[in-house]
Amino acid sequence: TRNLSILGGEPLCKENLDIVHYLCSDIKKRLPKTKIIIWTGYTLHQLKIRAKNDLRIKDLLDNLLDTIVDGPYKQELRDLRLKLRGSSNQKIWERTTTKFLRRKVWKEKKED
């Protein structure tokens, strides 16, 4: 299994959406077993609202993205013990065959 990580700036902003959708679609066609993970400042809830009016977002959520790390980075919630996230407000979502579920498996253990 291969993995592709998409992050930096805001990959799902209006200006980047065409290229991100094209890239994810092309990767899934050529390498269908590739898992795509994306970091976004948008919450999953915000993306679902946008998907009602944007077929690219809908396709990303329904077919192309495997994992979403959502929510803006917040300096006041910074926690270096978190896996894949910089601040505690961010959540990890993993797509099942029909929807995204919050991934509890990656929940960090509290250190004493």
Task: Describe every region a protein language model picked out.
Residues 1-59:
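Conserved Radical SAM active-site core
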